[in-house]
Curated annotation (Swiss-Prot):
Keywords: ATP-binding, Chaperone, Cytoplasm, Isomerase, Nucleotide-binding. Together with its co-chaperonin GroES, plays an essential role in assisting protein folding. The GroEL-GroES system forms a nano-cage that allows encapsulation of the non-native substrate proteins and provides a physical environment optimized to promote and accelerate protein folding. One of its GO terms (biological process) is protein refolding. ATP binds at residues 29-32, 86-90, 413, 478-480, 494. InterPro entries: Chaperonin_Cpn60_CS (IPR018370), Cpn60/GroEL (IPR001844), Cpn60/GroEL/TCP-1 (IPR002423), GroEL-like_apical_dom_sf (IPR027409), GROEL-like_equatorial_sf (IPR027413), TCP-1-like_intermed_sf (IPR027410). It comes from Mycolicibacterium gilvum (strain PYR-GCK) (Mycobacterium gilvum (strain PYR-GCK)). The keyword Nuclease does not apply. This is Chaperonin GroEL 1. Residues 523-533 have a biased composition (Basic and acidic residues). The keyword Nucleotide-binding applies. It catalyses: ATP + H2O + a folded polypeptide = ADP + phosphate + an unfolded polypeptide. It is found in: Cytoplasm. One of its GO terms (molecular function) is unfolded protein binding. It is an enzyme of class 5 (isomerase).
Length: 541
């Protein structure tokens, strides 16, 4: 396929146009008075959403050079979403402002590399300042406030706050679809750990990129599983039982893995393979915990249990298993209450006698996993479209709440960024030339999220930004009430992790665009003589 190349200014201009198109589509959703965007899907009904990353994912531009810019900004949104689960619109708006101001300076002769370095230094300084100014979050009420801001729904906020307090900060909160119209919270016995599926082919729900197994069997295996003849006899028995299978082992590889994958693709046997978490003795101990929770046995040749000889009797069970790329949650395992209580007692006794802090901490983590259970938020709605949107909102809210517990919160509404600008003063005195210019570019971009929150609320963005920059540190503009004041008191707060990710990711993408000298794209395949192409219509008949 032949390529098409653009250089310097032309390349950067086209990329900027793409950045603008994507950011303009997303930024109308910013803030409590943000609007919705309707996405027409190639199949199924249209989706209505106000979630930045969902909109960004749908956008592909016709002009290949503009599309490069759009895809770069899309990566800002997705990165921020992966780390913090929220803040994608803020990140997109920041990136747009940085690209705009940065390109103006490059066009005027600034050195893009130095400019980019200045932007990066400024981003780090602001990120540090945000972290330093964060307030820790502990109680259900403030966790609930974070979730309310994220989902724009007080009921959801309360449920998430309650869920997080019930299962503890290490506990697992999952989101399911409810069969009724109500959204409610259920706390069940369950256990989660930080290992996801070994292969993406195991995904069963493509929207959420998760593998969901209902009423599943669970195989726990101490060592690696690689040979197919070892696994096959058991697989055949599981297939006869007609139930999905979760495999937790040191690793699953080779023929064994490819057979599972082929079965998953053909849908002949629903199975998901996951690596057991931790190493060495901790891994052994955790597998034993899982055996207690699921009511199964760990298959281990050392105790005479050999994979190719065992039957269904060694398998545990679970009402539901949800696996994504980073984590596995087992809900309602088949282990008896007595066995689980016995195991907890044993762990507590070990904690008592342990003389090493590290061991004690790890034992306490295991106990928390066993005792914590899993909070399931069941989301209900009247229509399919509504359900999708609500479920997405609840998932974002849970992610935001977790981020808040991890690193604390800062004031929301774009105000924290405006106030964090003061952290750039020390850089201003030590940098010079185009690096200093980069810091100024960054300083000017910091107010862009607040500008759009105010604009979406129907006010003059510049006036609001000006006013907020004169307020003391904890104060800002509340776009829901259209008043200025103490935002933490009003519950207008963001997890600092979200705000920091937005700052860092926006800066890294802006640097990429600014330092682009050449853009190479596939030449679009064209119908004969329709006069498109990058020259934009040469045929003036």
């Amino acid at each position: 396929m032949s390529k098409q190349i653009e250089f310097n200014e032309t390349a950067r201009r086209a990329m900027e146009a793409g950045v603008d198109k994507l950011a303009d589509a997303v930024k109308v959703t910013l803030g409590p008075r943000g609007r919705h965007v309707v996405l027409a899907k190639s199949w199924g009904g249209p989706t209505v959403t106000n979630d930045g990353v969902t909109i960004a994912r749908e956008i592909d531009l016709e002009d290949p050079f503009e599309n490069l810019g759009a895809q770069l900004v899309k990566s800002v949104a997705t990165k921020t979403n992966d780390v913090a689960g929220d803040g994608t619109t803020t990140a997109t708006v920041l990136a747009q402002a940085l690209v705009k101001a940065g390109l103006r300076n490059v066009a005027a002769g600034a050195n893009p590399i130095a400019l980019g370095a200045g932007i990066a230094k400024a981003a780090d300084a602001v990120s540090e300042a945000l972290l330093a100014s964060a307030t820790p979050v502990k109680d259900a009420k403030s966790i609930g406030q974070v979730a309310t801001v994220s989902s724009r729904d007080e009921l959801v906020g309360e449920l998430v706050g309650e869920a997080m307090t019930k299962v503890g900060t290490d506990g697992v909160v999952t989101v399911e679809e409810s069969s009724t119209l109500n959204t409610e919270l259920e706390v069940t016995e369950g256990v989660g750990f930080d290992k996801g599926f070994i292969s993406a082919y195991f995904v069963t729900d493509f929207d959420s990129q998760e593998a969901v197994l209902e009423d599943a069997l669970v195989l726990l295996h101490r060592e690696k599983i690689s040979s197919l003849p070892d696994l096959l006899p058991l697989l055949e028995k599981v297939a006869e039982a007609g139930k999905p299978l979760l495999i937790v082992a040191e690793d699953v590889e080779g023929e064994a893995l490819s057979t599972l994958v082929v079965n998953a693709i053909r849908k002949t046997l629903k199975a998901v393979a996951v690596k057991a978490p931790f190493f060495g003795d901790r891994r052994k101990a955790f597998l034993d915990d899982l055996a207690v929770v699921t009511g199964g046995q760990v298959v281990n040749p050392d105790v005479g249990l050999v994979l190719r000889e065992v039957g269904l009797e060694v398998l545990g069970t679970a009402r539901r298993v949800v696996v994504d790329k980073d984590s596995t949650v087992i809900v309602d395992g088949g282990g008896t209450q007595d066995a689980i209580e016995g195991r907890k007692g044993q762990l507590r006794a070990e904690i008592e006698v342990s003389d090493s802090d590290w061991d004690r901490e790890k034992l306490e983590e295991r106990l928390a996993k066993l005792a914590g259970g899993v909070a399931v938020i069941k989301v209900g709605a009247a229509t399919e479209t509504d359900l999708k949107k609500r479920k997405e909102a609840v998932e974002d809210a849970v992610a935001a709440a977790k981020a808040a517990v991890e690193e604390g919160i800062v004031i929301g509404g774009g105000a924290a960024l405006v106030h964090a600008g003061s952290a750039l003063d020390s850089l201003r005195s030590e940098l010079k030339g185009d690096e200093l210019l980069g810091v100024e570019v960054f300083a000017s971009a910091l107010s862009s999220p607040l500008y759009w929150i105010a604009t979406n609320a129907g006010l003059d963005g510049a006036v609001v930004v000006n006013k907020v920059s004169e307020l003391p540190a904890g104060q800002g503009f509340n776009a829901a009430t259209l008043e200025y004041g103490d935002l933490i008191g009003d519950g207008v707060i963001d997890p600092v992790k979200v705000t920091r990710s937005a700052v860092v990711n926006a800066a890294s993408v802006a640097r990429m665009v600014l330092t682009t000298e050449t853009a190479v794209v596939e030449k679009p395949a064209e119908a004969e003589d329709d006069g498109h192409g990058h020259g934009h219509g040469h045929h003036h008949h």
